[in-house]
Amino acid sequence: MSHLVLTPGTLTLAQIREISRGKVTLELAESAIADINTSAGLVQQVLDEGRTVYGINTGFGLLANTKIAADDLQLLQRSIVLSHAAGTGQYMQDATVRLMMVLKINSLSRGFSGIRLEVINFLIALVNAGVYPCVPEKGSVGASGDLAPLSHMCLPLLGEGEMSYQGQLISAAEGLEIAGLKPIELAAKEGLALLNGTQASTALALEGLFNAEDLFAASSVIGAMSVEAAMGSRSPFDPRIHAARGQKGQIDSAAVFRHLLGGESEISLDHVNCEKVQDPYSLRCQPQVLGACLTQIRHAAEVLGTEANGVTDNPLVFQDTGDIISGGNFHAEPVAMAADNLAIAIAELGSIAERRIALLIDSNLSKLPPFLVENGGVNSGFMIAQVTAAALASENKTYAHPASVDSLPTSANQEDHVSMATFAARRLRDMSENTRGVLAVELLAAAQGLDFRAPLQPSKAVAQAKGELRELVSYYDKDRFFGPDIEAATDLLLTASYNAYLPAEILPSL
């Protein structure tokens, strides 16, 4: 478990990845406290002066013009949390909720939200205790923020809802007891500040980003394995080709392949006098395809890194002037578009990998035994494993349709254009799982192909990757129950061990 001293607005992608992948304890930097207190004081000043300001002493959405009496302000905060906790579907994973909470703490602590330190410390205490609110996956359109998910996240502050602790569902009362907390009463604006924001969609999109990075690394390593297994040419990775085009992602991807394949190997030397003029695109154009995916991953990283540190509450409190201004930072269009781009990248990584599998099992193209097995006919080898990969790759093509182009008005047309960011981000987990499955099949196929090339040896990095797999899955000498092999290869990919094969500067969060 790592410990993070949080200076609001300074989270790095590496820190966010660590929070996403493991438990963390938080401590708020002392430098943040003054801004939090000043911001909360300005909200109290509005009430003391009897002014009417949206989000502080008014209704919400279409009811924004309804002024709320001072005696009803605490009830209003409770009511908005309870009424907006209207999500549905399965609960998000604890890791997702943990990240969502840290992002909300990060945003609230910047001093633009008019929320008391007591409320922020309550959320920090839950994170530190490892007690997480139960948040349904569905119910947000990504504007006005992620209202339903964040409402469920905040129910325990009121002593309501369910929580998760060490994999078990418990009541909010039990969860608060574990964390040493008691329910609190929210003051003016605090309910809206807690619920308004893009932290649910951003957390899901960041998880998608980290999965996409892992898949890019795996695609590079396994793609290099397939080049060796198919006795492919190294010339398509020549740096002069990629410099002539000038696409940064492509240039970097080609460099990764040169790093993985090395200058030469026994396999490549044996291939010198090959009569084949060119390799199929799935081998030859890997830098062009994977490089384009890398560009989308990097762009999404920039957008999501900014969003993770941004303030997406409404209205915002500006300490230098005392102004409280209503805007639309809750609209998650940047997150939705970043997630859409990640979806395309994840789908393409799986699509080209499936084509490499098809190449390897086709003896006319690879010059390997049909379906990568001896005694074909009696043995079917990788025949149906490739069908599985095709099914997964095709499923992702449907998932990759952009979500951000959809919109459905809500709140009696007051909220008449929305981002659909939460779905855009949420589907990335399923897409990543599908592409991981495709790559698992390719990993098995490439290793099998390399075994058929023996005694010729591949590059050092490719041999190492093959060796890691062979510690888990043996050579496929005859037909056997294939499912466990795919599962073992998938588990290997889930360790993200292939990230270490790439230079550190390639992926944004590493």
Curated annotation (Swiss-Prot):
CDD domains: PAL-HAL. It comes from the Bacteria. Its main location: cytoplasm. Pathway: Amino-acid degradation; L-histidine degradation into L-glutamate; N-formimidoyl-L-glutamate from L-histidine: step 1/3. One of its GO terms (cellular component) is cytoplasm. GO terms for molecular function: histidine ammonia-lyase activity. Its EC number is 4.3.1.3. It is found in: Cytoplasm. The modification 2,3-didehydroalanine (Ser) is found at S144. Disulfide bonds: none annotated. It holds the Pfam family Lyase_aromatic. It catalyses: L-histidine = trans-urocanate + NH4(+). GO terms for biological process: L-histidine catabolic process to glutamate and formamide; L-histidine catabolic process to glutamate and formate. Contains an active site 4-methylidene-imidazol-5-one (MIO), which is formed autocatalytically by cyclization and dehydration of residues Ala-Ser-Gly. Keywords: Cytoplasm, Histidine metabolism, Lyase. There is a cross-link at A143-G145 (5-imidazolinone (Ala-Gly)). Belongs to the PAL/histidase family. This is Histidine ammonia-lyase. The lineage of its organism: Bacteria, Pseudomonadati, Pseudomonadota, Gammaproteobacteria, Alteromonadales.
